[in-house]
Amino acid sequence: MTVGLLYNKNKKESVHYVKLLTEAIVEISRRESAGREIWHVIDSADYRQDSAAASADLLISIGGDGTFLKTAAIAILRELPVLGFHLGTLGLLTEFEKNDLEKTVLRLVKGEYVIEERMTLRITVNDGEKNVFEKSAINDCVLSRGTLSKVAYIDLYINGAFVDTYPCDGIIVSTQTGSTAYSLSAGGPIVEPGNDVIVITPICAHYTDGRSIIARSTSKIEMRLCRPHRQMYVTADGYASMQIAPDAKVVCERGADKLRIIRIDPPNFYEALRRKTSERRARIHNEE
């Protein structure tokens, strides 16, 4: 078994933790298999991250949710399961804390885990002639205005039916996984991971009826600019972004790929949500 470790090598805490994790994987696999199958570790600091994944049987993300999303994008392309160790300030995708290292590795080596599948979004931007942007997202697609630009007027369609024109700063289209990310900050609903849905949440809608919509996962979501706008951007999972033309069409629908997350002790979602948000508040107060 070969494990690929992906992390931010510019963070000292991550580098130190990777060393401990590597030693634990090799030592525990040697002990549990009586030397018959020692697990191998590929450190992404020594390779390009996608190259590290090419030879791996599973990936481990070390860091926060941002690191996990980037690792997960590679895992989806390689059809690999991914496990997340949490080192950040708020982790709802990363199940395991850094203090759980040996216990987690032992359960992993012994095969005592399950694979949880999550849906993805397929995002396309069409300029009227061809697709100019095609990405997969685990959390969300965001269509938003530039920092200094005016209010945007966005037409929303679901399965070809016109829903409304939203005067707003943008619209977030998220999976159930992304419902606890940017969508939640914009006032969107919290959706349990087991429910495959698409959540549509306007950002700072300029009227009182700008509520979120929960659509079926099979729905086709389409966004167009009702009025020309100079600075509009589409972003996938917060890191893949491009400026779109005034007549462009943004389409979000269920992706063919699935994210496969390794779960050892499947957490109670609401307990994890409460614990993580409480930890974040405590850390913010301690920094003041």
Each model region followed by its residue ranges:
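Short glycine-rich anion-binding loops that position phosphate/pyrophosphate groups of nucleotides
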Residues: D65-T67, L90, T177-S179
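Short aromatic-centered micro-motifs
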Residues: L156, G178, V234
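Gly/Ser-rich helix-loop-strand patches that form or flank binding pockets
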Residues: K70, I74-F85, L90-L92
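ATP/NTP phosphate-donor binding region
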Residues: M1-L58, I62, K98-V114, V125-K135
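ATP/nucleoside-binding phosphotransfer catalytic cores, i.e., glycine-rich phosphate-binding loops
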Residues: L143, L148, N159-F162, R211-E288
